[in-house]
């Protein structure tokens, strides 16, 4: 069946002043792999850009035009600067709360301080934490993580699925014992079919698995419209487009790392 909507994508350099968004039926701002970059870089080729603080100003201005804007993050907002070492990820959670993050998926670095520490942090999160392809045995974490979320924007139902790569070799054995991996493609298709039956007009996969895996998943998928990815730190100046099993176009985006850029997606139904 033909899909009746238009997706327009671009990237925004997160300097001190960035051009705010114009209004559309649905506006999504997306980031990935912040790695505890709270402040802009002070030197180097990205001096004056990046960080949660730069994104804060951009989102504030953009929401004046698009109050229903969805901000999504594709994981690994922890680990990489002294902020994480000194404060154990709490600054990042509070920062994402302040930014009005709607949903994120679990990146491998979210587990760097262990399962109990992650639970402690996520209890303070105001946003949805999504991961559909893990059978989480640790009950405190299982209560905080959901496979998908559905929201309604301007009369349209938007379904968002969280997916995470195989964590074997990336996290501690203590974490692995409590996280049973499920095939990401099978899970994505199962969840997308469920969301389609629930009447979603747009189905998004929020993934932390890298661009190559996103492209493979898109080609073997059904009902997925958009993949917002992370993990490989890929700067996609233009979106990647893949045909799914039904010949429908799946759009894949990723915005580099550290918040130097934010992705912007305008959707008209």
Range-by-range predicted roles:
Residues 7-16:
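Bacterial N-terminal signal peptides
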Residues 21-269:
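Acidic, metal/ion-coordinating pockets
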Residues 1-4:
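Positively charged n-region of N-terminal signal peptides that target proteins for export
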């Amino acid at each position: 069946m033909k899909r009746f909507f238009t997706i327009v994508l671009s990237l925004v350099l997160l300097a001190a002043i960035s051009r705010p968004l114009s209004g559309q039926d649905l506006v999504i701002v997306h980031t990935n792999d912040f790695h505890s970059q709270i402040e802009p870089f002070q030197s180097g080729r990205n001096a004056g850009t990046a960080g949660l603080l730069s994104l804060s100003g951009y989102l504030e201005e953009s929401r004046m035009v698009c109050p229903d804007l969805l901000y999504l993050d594709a994981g690994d907002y922890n680990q990489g600067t002294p902020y994480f070492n000194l404060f154990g990820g709490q600054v990042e959670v509070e920062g994402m709360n302040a930014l009005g993050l709607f949903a994120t998926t679990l990146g491998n670095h979210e587990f760097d301080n262990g399962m109990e520490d992650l639970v402690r942090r996520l209890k303070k999160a105001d946003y949805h934490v999504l991961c559909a392809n893990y059978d989480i045995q640790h009950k405190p974490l299982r209560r905080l993580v959901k496979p998908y979320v559905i929201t309604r924007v301007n009369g349209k139902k938007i379904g968002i699925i969280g997916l995470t790569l195989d964590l074997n070799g990336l996290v501690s054995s203590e974490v692995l014992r409590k996280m049973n991996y499920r095939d990401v493609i099978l899970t994505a298709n199962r969840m997308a079919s469920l969301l389609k039956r629930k009447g979603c007009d747009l189905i998004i996969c929020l993934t932390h698995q890298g661009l190559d895996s996103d492209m493979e998943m898109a080609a073997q998928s059904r009902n997925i419209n958009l993949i917002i990815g992370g993990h490989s730190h890929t700067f996609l100046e233009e979106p990647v487009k893949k045909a799914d099993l039904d010949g429908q176009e799946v759009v894949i985006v990723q915005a580099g790392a550290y918040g130097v850029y934010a992705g912007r997606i305008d959707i008209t139904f």
